[in-house]
Amino acid sequence: MELEYESKRSLYIPYAGPILLEFPLLNKGSAFSIEERNDFNLNGLLPETVESIEEQAERAWRQFQDFKNNNDKHVYLRNIQDTNETLFYRLLDNHLEEMMPIIYTPTVGAACEHFSEIYRRARGLFISYPNRANIEDMLQNATKQNVKVIVVTDGERILGLGDQGIGGMGIPIGKLSLYTACGGISPAYTLPVVLDVGTNNQQLLNDPLYMGWRHPRITGEEYDNFVNEFIQAVKSRWPNVLLQFEDFAQKNAMPLLERYRDEVCCFNDDIQGTAAVTLGTLIAASRAAGGKLCEQKVVFLGAGSAGCGIAEQIIAQMKSEGLSDEEARARVFMVDRFGLLTDRLPNLLNFQSRLVQKSDSLSGWDSANDSLSLLDVVRNAKPDIMIGVSGQPGLFSEEIVREMHKHCTRPIIMPLSNPTSRVEATPQDIMAWTDGCALVATGSPFSPVSWKDKTYPIAQCNNSYIFPGIGLGVIASGASRVTDSMLMAASRALADCSPLVNDGEGPVLPEVNDIQGVSKIIAMAVGKAAQLAGVAVVTSEDVLSKAIAANFWLPQYRNYRRTSI
């Protein structure tokens, strides 16, 4: 993707010498000019040749290619990020498609598992429960003062890998890298945070290299109070910050979102971001298949907070297309490890109970068991769309996929579980079992599939299509909250960008290299929705567009001038 880098005014910098070279946001390395080397006491600290950022990026790209292992590539890129952030993001701009799977899913999963082993340098804030009396001081200690986006995790449900303790910090770091690379939010405005509340991962507790608090996870009132102390401190330190909850366990994710969504500008990417990108993909896929979403039946494998969040967004879209609430809910089937959720099942969570099927409507189903399996649901409900958010590999079996294809000529199948090792079925298998007829979108990146002399691109239904645009839209519009209407606007804007819909061919979602343009379109839709919802000051579309452009940071070096502290 060709990018234009405009020159901007000079920055006045109080740092000099080795201190300046150790400041990742300001370090230029070999690109410091002769004048800057003289002014900032850098003579002798750098090689003679003054390089451009493109020359630096070319060297870094060649070094990157020398690594054969993705985990080593991840460590290498993180090292660049921790020494020269501008170069890091220029490198991503030049090679986003190749590097996104390295800095985030799927490679980030292994980086979280081995966080304490590969640890090189501090980034972000580690807020531990034993140190809870000093939370306000910790926020003051942050190296970035004007924070606009925080991604926070407690490390309990990292991707499909479970409890990783403070190793979960790899997720906020990676996520915020994408806020910048895809959404243009300056790295100077981002802050990753891990809440260290202990870990129940015995392997970590026994690991002599583990750097977190060696204690079983706190729960209940202790946990709730600790999280609340953190959020109140954030409100005091940065009242207008966008706070993204990331990879909290199901038992905490929804309660935290419900408690704080009307108090601070926040959202949960696992619930709302996943729902928004999935809905956008489904709207586009339904259009490509020649119909509307309200005409489809949808079955989910996985009825946790993420799956139920997606289901509620689908129902909201179906209602906007003309269905009643009851009609829309009757078209959505939730299956978990115990089978189809029905009104006869005990001990359902609150967010699950709204998504049950009425037992009376299932009386004519062909099944030998009281518990209705995914195969039973596919055979009897005859869904058009099947979505996997189970975190368990291989559960979309050949029998199930072929059964679905019997009654649906162009099934939409979305195995969304991350990382790749947890996917419910591979695109190659799905295309083989449907004779190339399925529309497939996955949560992790997969190469195009060749089937009978035709190549099918596989859309990656990745939250990175959504959350950077949401963040940019919130910042540009000055939104004080993230509303359901803003998320719905993001989904519809993403659907409008579908190459398959607009061009009649290609993937359901845009190419990764087009993601910055997509983020700007989503930001505009989100900003307008925020104004309509009354959570942002109403402006003209032109003013909002200029605000988006002004807040879109590009990785280019600025000229520096010396000033005193």
Swiss-Prot record:
Tree of life domain:
Bacteria
Which residues act catalytically here? 104 (proton donor), 175 (proton acceptor)
Give the co-factor note: Divalent metal cations. Prefers magnesium or manganese.
Q: Output the Gene Ontology cellular-component terms.
A: cytosol
- Cross-referenced PROSITE patterns, in alphabetical order? MALIC_ENZYMES
Q: Does the keyword NAD apply?
A: yes
Q: Kindly list the positions annotated as binding a divalent metal cation.
A: 246-247, 270
Subunit notes for this chain? Homotetramer.
Protein name per Swiss-Prot or TrEMBL: NAD-dependent malic enzyme
Species classification: Bacteria, Pseudomonadati, Pseudomonadota, Gammaproteobacteria, Enterobacterales
Underlying gene: maeA
